Amino acid sequence: MSLADSVLAINNDLPIRTDSPVHSGKVRSVYWLTDADSRRLITTKGYNVPEDTPLAIMVISDRISAFDCIFHGEGGLKGIPGKGAALNAISNHWFKLFAENGLADSHILDIPHPFVWIVQKARPIKVEAICRQYITGSMWRAYSKGERVFCGITLPEGLEKDQKLPELLITPSTKGILTGIPGVPAQDDVNISRSDIEANYQAFGFEKLADIDLYEKLLKDGFKVISKALADIDQVFVDTKFEFGYVTDKDGNSKLIYMDEVGTPDSSRIWDGAAYRDGKILENSKEGFRQFLLNHFPDPDVLLNKDRMPEREALARDNDLPLEAMMQVSRTYTGVAEKVTGAPIPLPANPKADIIKILKDEYDLIV
């Protein structure tokens, strides 16, 4: 098997039995199971959900996206070796830690394979729940240009790049393009304030006003749990993005849960603790790949300027990145995962074949 064969780049063509179109995201693909298969698995596997809950198979890929584009490497390498397994392993670890600390559940019901989750259908909150402990990235870029109000929060004068903020800040943005909300542009990833959410909580997917407090509590509590665990391995949890949604429990009650992934190098910035104390920033997250791209291409404005999206898409499509750059990202992701979980990350030689075999033999979901 070649290195390219070990990468799962295309994850929306598995022969999983479904009666709905496969939903393909930047990294994961979702296969909604038939009602009959959902009910069968809930019964035979003993999932603790109502018997009529829709289930899905969520398959992660090794693709890497940055600046809203998918990048690829030399030698036909269409993704990062080990990336998908590393992301899932990290999320699985944090979700388990959340449960041990009495926080909310996640949407995951079963983990058949390192690349695969079986999840319950949730009603998503249309908010990217972003939490920041340090001033860097887009917040620093805005601050350095003189902006002091960020998502309705007034920042103090005198802050310096990459310093720890006086308090943990929640700086949400829109998830997807939302229309008809006063004061909120119909664009993806628009910064919003808590007052925006309060005034339009139902449009953002909240079932009741009090759940805004709950989502903020779950966001901050989850951040603190991960931050403490990362500090124990001398890593700095800088900022992150969580997602939330509602599910219905066996008693018919609606409850707020964590969705998607949490605390990964894709959804977070993680810095090396020793380097930070020495006044340096050593990225253990996708931010390192973003910085590589900005330095690799002669005109970094293409990657930053939303008005140049067609050029950016062509740049990503037409350029094979150096193999060493792709492998450096692989080492970052698998290294963080192994530190977090305390276990090596399995790298199957042919993940697609493995997934099909398990879903056929143990779940009877392959057609």
Swiss-Prot record:
Xref: InterPro entries: SAICAR_synt/ADE2_N, SAICAR_synthase_Vibrio-typ, SAICAR_synthetase_CS
EC number per UniProt: 6.3.2.6
Any Gene Ontology CC annotation: cytoplasm
GO biological process terms held by the UniProt record: 'de novo' IMP biosynthetic process
Coiled-coil blocks: none
Catalysed reaction, written as an equation: 5-amino-1-(5-phospho-D-ribosyl)imidazole-4-carboxylate + L-aspartate + ATP = (2S)-2-[5-amino-1-(5-phospho-beta-D-ribosyl)imidazole-4-carboxamido]succinate + ADP + phosphate + 2 H(+)
Name of this chain's protein: Phosphoribosylaminoimidazole-succinocarboxamide synthase
Species of origin: Shewanella baltica (strain OS223)
Lineage, broadest ranks: Bacteria, Pseudomonadati, Pseudomonadota, Gammaproteobacteria, Alteromonadales
